[in-house]
Amino acid sequence: MFKWVTPASTATLSRCTLPATTAATTTTTAMAATRTATTTTRTTRPQLLSIALTSLIIIVASFVPTTSGFRSIETNGGGRKLFGGYRITPKHCRATKTLPSSDPRANGPTICMFNHECAQRGGEVVGACMDGFLFGACCQIPPTHELASTLINEAQNAYFQQHQQQTKLQQSAAQSSFESYGEQQQSLSEEQVAQQPSQNIYDQQNLDKVYQQLDSSSSISPPNGAYGDEPQQQEYQSESEQPVRDENAYPTSSSSTEATQSQSSSASVEFEQEPSQPADASNDQTTQKINKQPVQPPNFHVHKHSVTINSPSSPPQNDDFVMQVLSTLPPEHADDHHIVFTTEVPTKITSGLQDQTSSESNSFEEVSSTPAATQKPKPKPTQMPTQKTTQKATQKPTPKPTQKAKPKPVPQLAESMKRPIQQKPQQVAKPKPSPKPAQSTNNHHHNHLILDGGEFTHSDITHPGADADLVEDLQFSTGYGPQPVYAEPPKQQQQQQPAEQSYISSSTSAKRPTTGHNSPTTVSSITTHVDSIESIILQLNNTSHGPSYNVVSQQTPSYGYPGAAVVQTEPAAQNPTFYQENESEKVQESDSQSDYGYTTTVNYESFYDKVSDEQDASAAVSQSAEMPTARPGYGEDVSAVLEDHTMPANGYHDAEAPVAPQTSEFNKMPVMGIAYPVDMSYMEEEGNLPATAAGYGQMSSDSYEASTESTYQKLSTVQTEEPQPTYVRPTTNANKQNRPVASYIGMVTMQHYNPQPGNGDYQAQVPPEVSVSSHTTKVQEQMDETSNGYQQSETTSGYVSPPTAVPAPAQRPQYDAVQGDASSERPVLVTASPRPRPKPSTKRPAVKRPISGESTKKKPQPQPSAGAYNQEKISEHSTRKPVSNGYDKVPESPITHIQIKKPSATQHKEQEQTGYPRPASPAGYEQTTAAAPAPAAPSLNYDKPDAPPSQYDQPSAPSASYDQLAPMPSLNYNEQHASSPGRKPSTAKPISTSYVTGPSTPRPPATVDYHYDNVPPLFMADDKLDAFIQSTAENIVGSTPGNYQPPLVATASTPAYAHRPTSSGSYGHKKPGFVQINGTPKPPRPTVLITPKPTAINLVTYSSLSDDSNKLASSTSSYVTGRPGVQGVSSNDFKDPGYFGSSPVHVAFTQSTTEAVYAVPSDDKPAFPGYFGPTPSYPAFSVPGEKVGQNVMEETYTSPNDFVNFPPVRNPNLNMSAASSAVTSDLDLSTPAFVEDVVLKDKMHTLVHKLVASLQGNFEALADMIEEPGSNKTVATYQAGAGGTAKPVRVVTTRKPVRTATTTRPKVTTKKPVTRVTTKAPNKKTSAVSTTTRKPATRRTTVAAKVTTTTRRPATKKPTRRVSSTVKTTTVSSARPADDEIVDEEDEEDVNPNPSDNEIDQGATLSSYGGANGRKIHSTSRTLPTPNLAFHSPSTECGVRPHVKSGRIVGGKGSTFGAYPWQVLVRESTWLGLFTKNKCGGVLITSRYVITAAHCQPGFLASLVAVMGEFDISGDLESKRSVTKNVKRVIVHRQYDPATFENDLALLELDSPVQFDTHIVPICMPNDVADFTGRMATVTGWGRLKYGGGVPSVLQEVQVPIIENSVCQEMFHTAGHNKKILTSFLCAGYANGQKDSCEGDSGGPLVLQRPDGRYELAGTVSHGIKCAAPYLPGVYMRTTFYKPWLRSITGVK
């Protein structure tokens, strides 16, 4: 209801403003609405008007609560504490269910679901713990992917359309009333305008403060208020009028010239400007007024009051959440242009109220600036883009008044372009920027603060970045495109659309959103999205994705258009020209814009029309562009958002494609919840600042920071006046890491602009740009988890600053920068482009530049500032801080700088080409990220920006830098680049984002189309993906931003490849992206997915699938290669195998391969060897050859099945492919993952033949053979045979193995084995040899498992007597000896019942696969045997394995029963035991205590149960029963920090001591000074077999090398994460991510064998970013560090 009303009212407003006169009235209306309280009487004039006002008020009222509710939701939902004191789902992951249905996010980009379900839907887990699969993790589904499949989405779409129609009607009705009201209001606004300049600063600050407080409801409003009448007018008009304007604008915009400029500028600034325009355009009559506006600070004042009350304003905030989804705004926007894409709608509503919020949410800050500019541009709009550009600066004051009325529609677009200039000349504009920041801030603040404030951390847990994104995303529930919901951008677009057409509108929207989206990205950072673990750590998603959606949106823009990328590069240079040529070269510009997904936005300002043309030109790309519409509005924002949230961050990044890919999944994380916190602190600081004029911006910033995402959007809305600030938004993007910070920066910048620039000095705009920068930073952060992103972020900030000078350009530049960055980082980040912008008109600046005046301004700004630019940068960073007022004051900046420092460094790097590469370095990036994450860090970041300012001065360099940024990722990007030349920057980021990218690209095309149509088309593209997007898009429909994603999705299929590249950059992060990687460049990307960890790898992968494979191969080892080669795409598709057809094929192939691979180990073998080879202690794969024999079987078996079956990456091997491609496809995991060694295979084959022969007659001989040769040799052979046997089975098994080897095995084993075993067992008994022989045969049938068992059996047989004399037999015997009882299961000992035995055997076999492998390894040190024998007195023994005779288990496969007797399964029981789920792993250390992870603490009203001696959780394959004990109490480490997983350790005290047995043995504690660095350790658990994969039924084991902490830290940096590896952490895994622990393994043991054959506990599974992702090794709690604590409680020695 609420939503509906809001839409209606908004729509009404919108309607009213639609006509030119209406525009004026709208302005008034908006103002009136803004000051509903103040001007209620006036509103009475027109009944409709009063009604509209009433609705607005109601909306405001509802929004305020809603906002509060949202906050709480953010806090509650986001902070949902599922487990003990910490919420498993990232805060941004508030499950869609918690969102109002109207919330676009409710579509489910982030839904609480099991990780494997998430993976199946191509989503990205943004907030899962290692045990996420057990509980539900925040799954960010690529809008395209998931939404499409979501009924809700469809419903939403339908609703949206319906809503839009209704809204239109309402709007038309309200239009008339609003017109009169608007006129009325306009006069007021005009009056106010005069005072606005003086009051601007103060009001802004005050408003900011007030709004920050109001945050949710006021927040939006404040922008208007902050702006004062004019701002409000603009904003409001933006909202109300925008639609009008849009309509007008459509026609006006229609004129390509005007449209182009208007669209370009307007897109980002349009909304903001709209209000201005209303003053201007609306005021044809009010022309004077507009002039006055700049002069009237009072307007601000009045607005302040009204703003506070302003319904529209406040609704937008809520809208972000509710409205966003709600069509309300969209309807308005629909009127506007349907630019109000559904996705954008929410923001749009927010925006609508403050148009900027949504659209410019990210860009809106820029818009904010621009709004002022807008006004100026307004007159300008009439002029050609070029003229506009020039006029902007020059004419701004004059033309504005003059052309105001007429240009209004176009002007908006033009304004957008001119915004920067406008802002400079116009004080109003400038104040507006300030207000805008305030609004943005508020919006963000609302969301961000809340999220940031408390929830931040949580996200961090899973995915810091995601968290941050989520936080911001909160507004956008999932942070995918919809969130950005910058309805505004769409609006602008709408206006633009007129000029260009819907398409352009779309494009504009997308692009604009880019700017705004940067901010929104921040806001968007919802996701989360973080990949699950990645989501957890990084996102700990991405990636993302989940998060894909946003990403998609964003990404698309980024390289939605090939041009986008180009724009980045070319546009940088070209853009300026284009900008100027805007109209004439629209198409080209479009290309440029294409280049920048976001860049487009930036470009948009300059050449919205062009963009549209280009979009038209490149429909597919266009989609991207269109997407940009959504994307910018949300693309960028979303990008950031998504990225942050879901890898979506990556997705967003995709917009920035280059950056996003790099961090892809990590980006999300990087966006760092940490960044959030930083933001928060910033916010707080900024909160103070708001007091000052700078404060306004700062306030905004503050809000921004706090609710960067939300606020950003909202702020954007508020700042609608300050489009330039939108640039700031990009800054935010740039700071994405500090997402909030960045946002804030932008905000602050705006403020600075306002205060400092005065209106004339567009430095004020610089801050807006900074704002963008901020946003960009955010995006970058998100996008870039990679250093690129971050640096970009910095850069963006810097850029943003300059843009401040040229708000419109800033905005545009933002995009440009972003694009450039985006290329490298997130398009938004590219905002940094602004840096280049000044100088590199060439790059982004060009885009901005086109704004001519703006460009000049921009440039001048940077130049004037050179110090100023620097300052701007500082300010930008600083801006966030107090610098706001001191934008000019670089000094203040410094503080900000400090915050930005890191980014700065990054930026610096980024800026410097060299720098960029460095950013490319995850380390730098990470730092940036870190900076973002830590408020303090941000300070540093900011500081650095100080330096960057210099660089900023040389934006050109930065531009190059960006390119260079791209360079690092260049490989990827280049590929991407190839796809979209402009995208080159993409190259920088893409690495990380790589995988995300894939998916998103496809989407854009679809989106573009429907985006084009605005609402209706919105849903059309990519139904499935688009469906997902649809809902999003639909939401976004109003605002193209949403469409953004869809376009990406649209391209998903093959086109995806083509488009994907575009998407890729932005989308790269998206986890879904993996699959989507199809982007043309993506094909390689898929592989990239596989290699997400290493940037380099990504790059390579990026290059081409083959390359990818190679890369993987080289990086990973053969195994990777094999797998990638075979499944390069598959991998990528893996996630979306379902989503994308490609995957299936691979899967099939893989399956075949599995068998084949198994058989043809050479192929996969390389891949597996990497996986498996390492798995065993044996580093060499050849060694595995022996063990691999069985192992291979096992692995192969496990691999396919495991991957398919269990998401747990417990089987890192499985995860190998997943790592890069993160379980891109089942095949991926299956065939390649388990290829062990060719030698093994050969042996197996030979053995199999032998076995077959022997089975027929010489089973005894076989057994003897096994025993005599020294279990090792024989065993190996035997096993090999078994393996061979298994192999054939395996083929079948492979499929079956969905559960992967383990499951399959168990199943096969269980069923077949039992029967066979039983039958055979007797035979066996009769003739042990004979039986054995037979059994193997049976086993064979069973699947390799049996064979494996067979091997064991022989051992077992001996073991029968083995207990006494097991030395020889020991190998097998040992394992079996303790077996005696166990023997039957492991051996075919007649002692135990055959069936059981068989079953167990099977289990053993399964285990055998892992365990057999171990046996194979036949670490003959049958040390175990001794333990086995000794085991009879388990009470005195620890670390022994009575059931296992072989030394080690080769990793990544099912282990054997009793192989890890200390393994505990921690289950959670809820509802009095009605529901139980496997939550985590654990380690038995004494008869009464179990160690697990702190994040495994029980949820609300839940209790934990510890199951000892468990092996097959699906059935009873064990010879011995497991023992279940209730947990009496959970002792969580006091210093446990869910945000960083510090001290992630907990002790479970059992209600009664457990009786030790052969299958229940405690683990030994390591020596206090033990150092396991460089050794191979074994991780066991029932966690997912691969990231996003399924869960195995039998215990899985994986061998991983323990890495030195410093190396681990470096690896994380390389992957673009700034995660700090503490001394209490222990890292284990491979650089190429072959194997790793995964969700569900949490709390499980990481053990090593001591010289005496016993096993000791090196660490417990804690967390990781994704699972087995390149350069993201798993993180464990170092046992030696916690021994004192453990000893103090348990007394263990």
Swiss-Prot record:
Known role: Probable endopeptidase. In tracheal terminal cells, acts downstream of ich to regulate seamless tube growth and/or maintenance probably by processing lumenal matrix proteins.
Paired cysteines (S-S): 1480-1496, 1608-1627, 1638-1667
Gene3D superfamilies, per database record: Trypsin-like serine proteases (2.40.10.10)
Comp. bias intervals (Acidic residues): 1380-1391
Span list, region Disordered: 170-198, 212-321, 352-465, 477-524, 615-635, 752-1007, 1057-1090, 1297-1435
A GO CC annotation given for this chain: perivitelline space
Compositional bias segments (type: Low complexity): 230-241, 252-268, 358-404, 422-431, 488-501, 1297-1307, 1331-1353, 1362-1376
Family membership noted in the UniProt record: Belongs to the peptidase S1 family.
UniProt key word RNA-binding: no
E.C. number: 3.4.21.-
Positions of glycan attachment: 541, 582, 1215, 1272
GO molecular function: serine-type endopeptidase activity
Keywords from the named record: Cell membrane, Disulfide bond, Glycoprotein, Hydrolase, Membrane, Protease, Serine protease, Signal-anchor, Transmembrane, Transmembrane helix
Knockout mutant characteristics: Embryonic lethal. RNAi-mediated knockdown in tracheal terminal cells results in cystic dilations and discontinuities of the apical membrane; terminal cells are severely pruned with terminal branches largely devoid of lumenal membrane, except for isolated inclusions.
Topological domain spans for side Cytoplasmic: 1-47
Catalytic machinery residues: 1495, 1544, 1642
Name of the molecule in the record: Serine protease filzig
Composition-biased stretches (Polar residues): 178-198, 212-222, 274-294, 502-524, 771-799, 951-962, 989-1000
Transmembrane segments: 48-68
Cellular localisation: Cell membrane
